């Protein structure tokens, strides 16, 4: 782990401007509304979380995989590579980078197949269509896009430090930690430094637990306007999330999602899976 966030590739290359992010997303917003795109973000974060839990990965590995996923689609359209392929690829790469140990090929494919069938069958009625050669090829494109900038900083460590400094670990840490986990269903990890996200999550936890921490926050040397921006995104997430019926809505949204086109000369090779067995756009 690099020692200084401000000198890291995470800060120098992967804290993005919101307007640039929205500009890159316009290709997908021709097919999806902003709300539908946001629901896709939640859904595929849930897929990565479920896959990581099935493989018994640490939460930091799952969080890193989620950041990789978001970084790729911050630069490319959803139709460039099928997100159903990208999700396990990100988990595979993150498990190596975070020194969890390489997840075996058999376990990864078995986990993806099982998770889609048991947890997300309402959205994916067919079998997981990819094999390890697809994941290794997808990993190459992911590494190329990220320019091998693989170290990701997360809000968990600064959150621990802040809660300990505040002296309310038992009261605040479990809730603030869950809120940090939820932020990965938004764009926050692409837009703000992790310590700011940690402070915003702690602030929300203080409000929920009715802990008066105004003095503690007032003494911080931090741009509170940015913290409030993050808090607004978190509150918006919870407001929209409670009205999101994933089981009813996702099949329709996935059908609208732009998809990779099959290579023109491989129609006969793809069998029943069509373009999904390729997973890559040729356009």
Curated annotation (Swiss-Prot):
<feature type="region of interest" description="Disordered">
    <location>
        <begin position="252"/>
        <end position="283"/>
    </location>
</feature>
<dbReference type="InterPro" id="IPR031658">
    <property type="entry name" value="Cyclin_C_2"/>
</dbReference>
<feature type="domain" description="Cyclin N-terminal">
    <location>
        <begin position="46"/>
        <end position="144"/>
    </location>
</feature>
<keyword id="KW-0195">Cyclin</keyword>
<keyword id="KW-0805">Transcription regulation</keyword>
<dbReference type="Pfam" id="PF00134">
    <property type="entry name" value="Cyclin_N"/>
</dbReference>
<keyword id="KW-0010">Activator</keyword>
<dbReference type="InterPro" id="IPR036915">
    <property type="entry name" value="Cyclin-like_sf"/>
</dbReference>
<dbReference type="Pfam" id="PF16899">
    <property type="entry name" value="Cyclin_C_2"/>
</dbReference>
<dbReference type="InterPro" id="IPR043198">
    <property type="entry name" value="Cyclin/Ssn8"/>
</dbReference>
<dbReference type="InterPro" id="IPR013763">
    <property type="entry name" value="Cyclin-like_dom"/>
</dbReference>
<dbReference type="InterPro" id="IPR006671">
    <property type="entry name" value="Cyclin_N"/>
</dbReference>
<dbReference type="GO" id="GO:0005634">
    <property type="term" value="C:nucleus"/>
</dbReference>
<comment type="function">
    <text>Component of the Mediator complex, a coactivator involved in regulated gene transcription of nearly all RNA polymerase II-dependent genes. Mediator functions as a bridge to convey information from gene-specific regulatory proteins to the basal RNA polymerase II transcription machinery. Mediator is recruited to promoters by direct interactions with regulatory proteins and serves as a scaffold for the assembly of a functional preinitiation complex with RNA polymerase II and the general transcription factors.</text>
</comment>
<keyword id="KW-0539">Nucleus</keyword>
<dbReference type="GO" id="GO:0016538">
    <property type="term" value="F:cyclin-dependent protein serine/threonine kinase regulator activity"/>
</dbReference>
<comment type="subunit">
    <text>Component of the Mediator complex. The cylin/CDK pair formed by ccnc/cdk8 also associates with the large subunit of RNA polymerase II.</text>
</comment>
<dbReference type="GO" id="GO:0006357">
    <property type="term" value="P:regulation of transcription by RNA polymerase II"/>
</dbReference>
<comment type="similarity">
    <text>Belongs to the cyclin family. Cyclin C subfamily.</text>
</comment>
<keyword id="KW-0678">Repressor</keyword>
<keyword id="KW-0804">Transcription</keyword>
<feature type="compositionally biased region" description="Polar residues">
    <location>
        <begin position="267"/>
        <end position="283"/>
    </location>
</feature>
<protein>
    <recommendedName>
        <fullName>Cyclin-C</fullName>
    </recommendedName>
</protein>
